[in-house]
Amino acid sequence: MKVEENLSMFRAKTILAAVLLLIVGSGGFSGPVSAQTPKALTPAEQIAEIAILAAGSRTVLNQIRRNGIERGRISRIGQDGRSEDTRYEMRFVRGDKTEKDKVRIDNKTPQSEYSLVFGDGKIFGIINGSPFQPRAEATADFISQQAHSLDALLRYKENESTLASAGKDKHQGIDVFVVDLTDKANRKTRYFVSVKTYRVLWLEYEDTPPGASTPVKYMKRFYDYRFAQNTWLPYRTVLTEDGKQTVETRILTVTYGVKIEDSLFQNPEAASTTNP
């Protein structure tokens, strides 16, 4: 594991040096600019591109993580301080952009089993084989988790998001780059990227839940990065709301490149209409 990590960091830093060399070299170019001249990367884009390389490279991520199955456990802490565990299985097929992704999350709690499905820009639920409309809070949470995620940075170019550098900072002795991302829906996320490893250590954002009048400050921290099929993935994620931990997600297994049937993302009502 240590050898793989060192190789990954060596590759990322080597590419970083090459990128910086290209940028510096292009600065002294005084000839006419053609339509084919590549656009120079901004400081924020440089950081994001190296983070993508450190995670496995855009090509590898697009190929390996095109589809897959992730299984794990979610622990939610209620206002009374009690924790409720949910087992989940997430199956997904990536599109060219996040909005074209297909995602199905099957949840199992001690009280019930249900699924949330995102496809064709719509979200619906399934319980006992019948569709239902999820609560506004559940829908908003689903959308928020996709919009303010690690993948949102790794896929910023595909999603046509804009990046801006907020400088460099130090938190608890750790040097980090600070990158602000704004997506096409004007949702904003701030990422804190390790200067040493170029991994995203945590992200922050604000959102106003349905029915609330004031925004909530969210922080999502990433731990336990592991090597999975030539890509790096955090196996533990902790979400806090206004400084209080509310959700902890642990990945148990993840497998990429498996065939996912398209019928899994189809609304049962639409399926019965299509196939009477």
Model-predicted regions and their roles:
Residues M1-A12:
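N-terminal secretory signal peptides that target proteins for export/translocation
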Residues L16-L22:
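Sec-dependent N-terminal signal peptides
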Residues I23-P32:
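C-terminal segment of classical bacterial N-terminal signal peptides
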Residues P38-A40, Q46-P131, T162-S165:
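N-terminal mature ectodomain segment of secretory-pathway/periplasmic proteins
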Residues F124-D151:
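Acidic/charged, solvent-exposed loop-and-adjacent secondary-structure segments enriched in E/D, K/R, S/T
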Residues F142-D180, L201-L203:
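Short, conserved active-site entrance elements at the starts or edges of catalytic domains
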Residues Q172-P268:
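Gly/Pro-enriched, hydrophobic low-complexity segments
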Residues Q266-P276:
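Gram-negative outer-membrane assembly/targeting C-terminal domains
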